[in-house]
Amino acid sequence: MPTLNLERLQALRARTFRVLPKARLTSPAQAVDFVNERGFVFFWPVKGLLLPSLWTAVAGDRPVADEHDDPGHVTWGWKDNSLDKRVWYYGKILHRKATFISLEIAPYFYALSENYGDIAEDHLVAYEEGRLTLAAKLVYEALLSKGKMNTIDLRKEAHLTSKSSDSEFNRALEHLQADFKVLPVGTAEAGAWKYAYQFDITARHFPELPEKARRIGEAEARRKLAELYLGSVGAVQLRDVTRLFGWPPELSKRTLAHLVESGKLCAGLSHPQTAGEWFALTELVD
């Protein structure tokens, strides 16, 4: 059985994750270039999910600091200041964690979402079929009718202001973000902390996104995203793809098989330190 070359794998990840000091990001413009280069990255590292993150590319391969004055937290300002600039797509997407997506790649994600063209109707179908909670429906309809709102006002409009509604409201926002129905588009001085995200309907903030996505088939979208993922991490097991993207195992397997058939990946590989079948870029195989 062919074996992964760990030295080459580690070298690739050091490059794509920007862990070396000389490769670190030092400006918002470099951060945008980094996201465009990788296609999609996490804001902060996510335990159990291997993917480049803005934090690591700025602060190095270390845990996110608790101290607010840590130099690595410059990333927070970069994120907030970019939300209304349309330089990338940002929201709680992959595994419902904070994710940056390049504008070129966003249509591939959108093509896999449950959005089919009518922003005033899709959510109703999803609700009637049990794929959208009542809280998510209320939040979405508040934004649909009133326009961009900060989270404090949004809770009031959605009638989810009670303390017992905290988790319900937060889950609704996460679900709507993960399905590309809403996204944060700015911040506002609101609430006790004088800080709150502003949200809007995705298709209203990026009106060209649905049309671009309409030309992309689901299988094509999955292949593109899986190829970018492998380009960032070099080698994966089937479960890694399934967990990151939330795809059914059979679709993940079919997607990887197509990349193998096209010569972009090798399959049936062994890892010197981890059992199971691995898929990897061809240049990482001995």
Residue ranges and their predicted role:
Residues M1-D286:
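Long, low-complexity intrinsically disordered regions
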